[in-house]
């Protein structure tokens, strides 16, 4: 794979990028009235990079239309090639245009296809799906076709690309675009290796969180975009990661931002969507008592003793993680981990009361939890109060998922209960104006993406986000730890997350400060 070279063309490109807003690239007529001004800037930015066969990270906030900006880029490219051919002016080369490849999570493959059909129906799109034999036939047929007849855009998932990687090697694409690029944050995974093996003239990565926890994640994405630009990982770690993370070196941070800045475009909703109504976040506390408090105290003490005994640095990590999960479940509702528990859950009662008041006032509510079993308990309690709800978890069939999403926009059901992992991406639920996070999740980016199911283009009402916290527990201290960990990601590029596996023993102990 060709490594990035800092040459004269690179200097010209940087100068062009500094004046990207003044560079004139015609927006495809089919999208001229659809693209917002900031999306046109994103389109121009990508075209400027592509002109020099370079890549970048489109890191806009969730809901700002990263997909649409890419559709504009690809539509412009293939329309211009078609027009050049019709005019008999193909430049110095006679080759037909190469197809482009989009790689995304499996849950978004059909969404990409639908977006092309909606916004740029003239682009020929091939969705890779089916059995191994069917996929092989799809790709072989594509290769047999002339570029003027075959698909211009091929869309596949990370998992299928890994399985079919041999079919892609030996051919070159015009663009390779990876969606939800945080999937390749670990450079050692087969998924990361597979996308980096593809030959393409220009590459782009779409993600709202290019840095979730470690700077190595940013390095891995740049290793996909322009191998060698941030050097080898060993050199990057010595020059930037260690000085910034361990020593808070401002010079290293400034140097890294200066290097990556031209290749990362990040816009926030509050900056570009002036018409988007406000968003307010509130923390709602509950206080455990009785048996719930006793169970939490005993479990927290047991875990503190294990940590003090060095369990986190030995072979006991899995047991520590298991006990942490149990503590979180006790905060949600002790019945999640104690079958014979018949007492109250302070947070559940607070939650039901909040939903009852909101639904009575005519609001529609999204509620997210990591635990599907907790969502089922909430649904049962709501039924006791005469409140109906939809429930979406990982096991929900795709057809039922689509039906519920469509129904929620128009039916009288006021509550949509969604597991965090099942509903974090690919849903548009702007009918809701209240979002409840029942339990704090280590991954703040996932929580924010969940909130953006409601707070996005199309939302006409102010949105209120409630985070439910059990006071004087691990949940309360987790919020403090998240803020500290997020600071690094915010300094470099974006928002971030806390990964339990990355915490030191001292940081784990801090989760229990001022708690039993």
Predicted feature residues:
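ASCE P-loop NTPase motor core, strongest for the SF2 helicase catalytic module
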Residues: 3-248, 257-516
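Long, charge-dense, solvent-exposed interaction surfaces that engage phosphate-rich ligands
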Residues: 253-255
């Amino acid at each position: 794979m060709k490594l990035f070279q800092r040459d004269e063309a690179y200097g010209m490109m940087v100068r062009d990028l500094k004046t990207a807003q003044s560079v004139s690239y015609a927006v495809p007529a089919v999208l001229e009235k659809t693209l917002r001004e900031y999306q046109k800037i994103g389109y121009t930015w990508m075209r400027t990079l592509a002109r020099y066969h370079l890549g970048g990270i489109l890191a806009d906030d969730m809901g700002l239309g990263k997909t649409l900006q890419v559709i504009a880029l690809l539509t412009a490219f293939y329309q211009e090639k078609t027009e050049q051919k019709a005019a008999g002016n193909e430049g110095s080369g006679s080759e037909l245009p190469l197809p482009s490849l989009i790689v995304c999570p499996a849950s978004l493959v059909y969404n990409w296809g639908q977006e092309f059909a909606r916004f740029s129906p003239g682009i020929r799109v091939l969705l890779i799906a089916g059995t191994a034999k069917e996929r092989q036939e799809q790709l072989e047929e594509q290769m047999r076709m002339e570029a003027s007849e075959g698909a211009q855009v091929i869309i596949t998932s990370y998992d299928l690309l890994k399985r079919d990687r041999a079919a892609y090697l030996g051919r070159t694409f015009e663009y390779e675009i990876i969606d939800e690029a945080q999937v390749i944050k670990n450079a050692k995974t087969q998924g990361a290796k597979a996308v980096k093996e593809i030959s393409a003239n220009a590459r782009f990565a779409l993600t709202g969180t290019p840095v979730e926890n470690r700077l190595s994640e940013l390095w891995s994405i740049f290793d996909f975009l322009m191998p060698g630009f941030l050097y080898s990982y060993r050199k990057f770690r010595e020059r930037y990661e260690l000085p910034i993370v361990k020593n808070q070196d401002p010079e290293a941070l400034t140097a890294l931002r200066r290097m990556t800045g031209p290749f990362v475009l990040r816009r926030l909703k509050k900056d570009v969507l002036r018409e988007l109504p406000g968003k307010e976040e509130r923390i709602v506390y509950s206080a455990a008592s009785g048996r719930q408090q006793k169970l939490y105290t005993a479990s927290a003490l047991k875990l503190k003793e294990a940590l003090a005994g060095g369990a986190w640095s030995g072979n006991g990590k899995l047991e520590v993680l298991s006990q942490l999960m149990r503590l979180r479940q006790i905060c949600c509702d002790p019945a999640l981990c104690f079958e014979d528990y018949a007492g109250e859950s302070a947070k559940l009662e607070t939650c039901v009361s909040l939903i009852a008041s909101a639904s009575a006032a005519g609001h529609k509510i999204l509620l997210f939890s990591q635990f599907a079993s907790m969502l089922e308990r909430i649904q049962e309690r709501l039924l006791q109060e005469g409140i109906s709800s939809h429930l979406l978890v990982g096991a929900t069939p795709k057809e039922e998922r689509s039906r519920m999403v469509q129904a929620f926009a128009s039916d009288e059901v006021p509550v949509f209960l969604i597991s965090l992992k099942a509903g974090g991406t690919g849903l548009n639920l702007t009918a809701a104006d209240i979002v409840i996070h029942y339990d704090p999740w280590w991954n703040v980016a996932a929580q924010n993406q969940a909130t953006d199911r409601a707070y996005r283009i199309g939302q006409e009402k102010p949105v209120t986000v409630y985070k439910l916290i059990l006071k004087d527990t691990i949940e309360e201290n987790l919020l403090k730890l998240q803020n500290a960990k997020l600071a690094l990601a915010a300094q470099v590029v974006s928002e971030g997350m806390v990964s339990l596996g990355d915490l030191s023993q001292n940081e784990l102990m801090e989760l229990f400060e001022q708690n039993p």
